[in-house]
């Protein structure tokens, strides 16, 4: 591999001379302690995992690559996703699109879950006109709910949605009421809300949602009749406001207040309209959306197959950044995977030709205001960037004044950081001097004061 490219507006540098097992990146996963796992197995546009790739899993930790070669993966081919257990930092699961689910503890493979030793199922060869002895356990993804139960999604299986409780019991959810077995070709990654509602995309039947409402299982879907541009949903992401962002092979939609999917029958997804430069148009119309990430400021990062990576404002109505191979270190405009690392603020972008990291300036919310930081500080002449304040909580009021108390900027946080363009309410850049930054939580119980020197 060629190492990891770290990009910020002023420099691009290779972080380590070692690298992933190969530059062909299929999916990136962020693990605890700023670690990364990268898969190289794959499926094609139609979720076909053949030819079955015998590739290992790349792992980046503490500045070095500590990769798991295929030889230790118990024969699991076409590994497409790695997911950490949020209640056990030393445990991850690797999803294989043919051989089941690998359990890895402290970097050692300890189990290969399949149809012989778990509640997972192989596809039905008779249903699919295959050799009766054919077995294929096609696990696209797993995700964990608030109780620590692990959910998984499997292709070409009637009861394709599985739940493994912390006690090791398996439960199966029948999807055939929405999706015939022979058309359950593939699914997106899973997203689980704070209320334990499960959302995922399907190749042929749109967005799928599952929840238990007052103890009753509810299975719902959205398709083109509900304003999706196509039934082929490739990526889903929940933001801080319980809005579900839906990426398809033909564009982007949003389901506001997503939990309504389970209680209302007349829902439709919303099209986002972008107005820039006097032009009005649909956001990402006809674009193949491959991956969506929500950063610590509730901004939306969207990867595409052919148009690079976009960063949109919280509401999706303005473009903050658009990275392409022409204006950034991206080696190609076909970007398969995004991963946001909340501690560092980095966004990782995985492509068929390599991995790029962008040093973003959105951080996850802090638990208190004890470590508020301001940078750059001081701000020197000719600096044209933003001032960043991070270490904040959500819904803090941030007020910036000059040394005698005249307010020049005020905002309310949506995540762990805010940015100021150094302009006052008049729109002009502020004068040289010391400025005070007052931060107060929305309940008024915590506060912090910082200073910044601005030199023009």
Question: Would you name each region that the model predicts?
Answer:
Residues 413-444:
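Short, surface-exposed loop/turn motifs with a glycine/proline- and acidic-biased composition
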Residues 454-456:
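Interdomain boundary/hinge segments at the C-termini of tandem beta-sandwich modules
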Residues 145, 193, 391-393, 413, ...:
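Surface-exposed coil/turn segments at beta-strand junctions on protein surfaces, enriched
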Residues 367-399, 417-420:
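Glycine-centered coil/turn sites that cap beta-strands in beta-rich domains
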Residues 447-452:
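Edge beta-strands of extracellular beta-sandwich domains
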Residues 1-371, 407:
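Carboxylate-rich, polar loop motifs that coordinate divalent cations or form catalytic acidic clusters
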Residues 141, 291, 309, 397-398, ...:
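Generic short beta-strand
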Residues 397-408, 427, 435:
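Short, glycine-anchored, charge-dense loop/turn motifs used at functional sites
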């Amino acid at each position: 591999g060629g190492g990891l490219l770290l990009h910020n507006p002023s420099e691009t540098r290779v972080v380590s001379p070692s690298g992933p097992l190969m530059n062909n990146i299929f999916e990136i996963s962020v693990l605890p302690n700023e670690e990364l796992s990268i898969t190289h197995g794959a499926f094609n546009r139609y979720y076909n995992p053949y030819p079955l790739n015998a590739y290992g899993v790349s792992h980046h930790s503490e500045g070095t690559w500590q990769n798991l070669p295929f030889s230790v993966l118990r024969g699991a081919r076409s590994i497409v996703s790695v997911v950490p257990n949020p209640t056990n930092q030393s445990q991850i699961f690797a999803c294989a699109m043919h051989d089941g689910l690998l359990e890895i503890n402290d970097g050692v493979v300890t189990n290969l879950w399949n149809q012989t030793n778990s509640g997972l199922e192989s596809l039905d060869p008779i249903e699919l006109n295959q050799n009766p002895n054919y077995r294929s356990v096609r696990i696209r993804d797993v995700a964990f709910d608030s109780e620590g139960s692990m959910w998984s999604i499997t292709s070409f299986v009637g009861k394709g949605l599985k739940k493994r409780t912390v006690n090791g019991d398996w439960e199966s959810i029948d999807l055939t009421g929405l999706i015939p077995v022979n058309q359950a070709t593939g699914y997106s990654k899973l997203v689980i809300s704070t209320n334990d509602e499960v959302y995922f995309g399907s190749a042929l039947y749109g967005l799928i949602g599952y929840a238990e409402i007052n103890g009753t299982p509810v299975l719902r879907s959205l398709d083109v009749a509900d304003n999706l541009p196509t039934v082929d949903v490739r990526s889903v992401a929940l933001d801080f406001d319980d809005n579900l962002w839906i990426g398809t092979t033909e564009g982007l939609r949003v389901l506001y207040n997503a939990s309504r999917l389970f209680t209302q029958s007349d829902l439709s997804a919303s099209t986002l309209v972008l107005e820039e430069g006097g032009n009005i148009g649909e956001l990402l119309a006809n674009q193949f959306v491959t991956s969506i990430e929500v950063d610590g400021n509730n901004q939306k990062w969207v990867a595409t197959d052919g148009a690079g990576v976009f960063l949109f404002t919280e509401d999706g109505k303005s473009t903050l950044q658009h990275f392409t191979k022409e204006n950034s270190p991206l080696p190609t405009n076909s970007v398969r995977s995004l991963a946001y690392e909340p501690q560092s603020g980095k966004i990782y972008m995985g492509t068929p030709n390599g991995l790029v990291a962008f040093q973003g300036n959105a951080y996850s919310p802090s638990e208190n205001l004890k470590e508020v930081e301001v940078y750059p500080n001081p701000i020197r002449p000719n600096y044209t960037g933003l001032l960043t304040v991070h270490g904040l909580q959500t819904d803090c009021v941030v007020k910036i004044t000059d040394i005698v108390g005249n307010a020049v900027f005020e905002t309310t946080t949506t995540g762990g950081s805010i940015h100021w363009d150094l302009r006052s309410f008049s729109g002009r850049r502020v004068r040289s001097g010391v400025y005070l930054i007052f931060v107060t939580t929305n309940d008024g119980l915590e506060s912090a004061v910082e200073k910044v020197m601005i030199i023009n």
